[in-house]
Amino acid sequence: MKKILVAILAALFTQTFADTPEEWITRANKAIKTEIRASSNSIHSKYSLGSLQDASAILDSALERFPYRIDIWLGQVQLNGEMENCKAQARYFEKIHELLKTKKDKCELKGGQKIADADKLLEGEFTIAARQHFDKENDACYEMLARQMLKFLPNSVEALNAMSVVHLLQKNDSAIVYLEKAHKLNPSDCIVIHNIAEFYKRKGNQKKHEEYTMKEALICKQ
């Protein structure tokens, strides 16, 4: 009778504390809390730093057990973006890139989904992470991720455009080098065309500005 009771309790324990990637993700999500912040003219809610750090620690533990779950690595990128810790984001992106390059057959997303196009996945996640810093006018973090993105994806239009934005923000003429390469790779990319037009507008080159403004009107505003 005692053995049966122990077996039942063990089964219940296993069911309650199932050690799966999804269970770890749920724990991390539950750890995240919001707090009310007040300024001189507004009241708003924001994730508390302590809870984000707790969630990140939970995901680190999950990755020790499930190192090939790329969605958990990407969760760390997102959490550290909320904490504006771009150095940590860069470290996690480095690991993701390494895994996708050397162990792609073992890597998975949610539900065991395999990764068909690793470059496309990286491009999309880098773009989201970098854009978050751009929107917050955190130029140093934006530049860090843009440079890393280009290092890993040298022929990505998104990466080339991101680096052009870094140079545009610095009023550096090298921006056009990245824009021209991106335009050559994808002549119909509307963001690239717009940025080329903007570059020539800043340089006072009316002829080139009008040329690319017309291209933008023809290709992008149909």
Where are the model-predicted features located?
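Terminal, low-structured helical/coil segments at or just beyond the last alpha-helical repeat
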Residues: 22, 27, 195-222
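Canonical positions in the second alpha-helix
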Residues: 62, 95-96, 148-149, 181-182, ...
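Short coil turns that delineate tetratricopeptide repeat
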Residues: 67, 101, 154, 187, ...
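Structural signature of tandem alpha-helical TPR/SEL1-like repeats
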Residues: 50-57, 84-92, 134-145, 169-181, ...
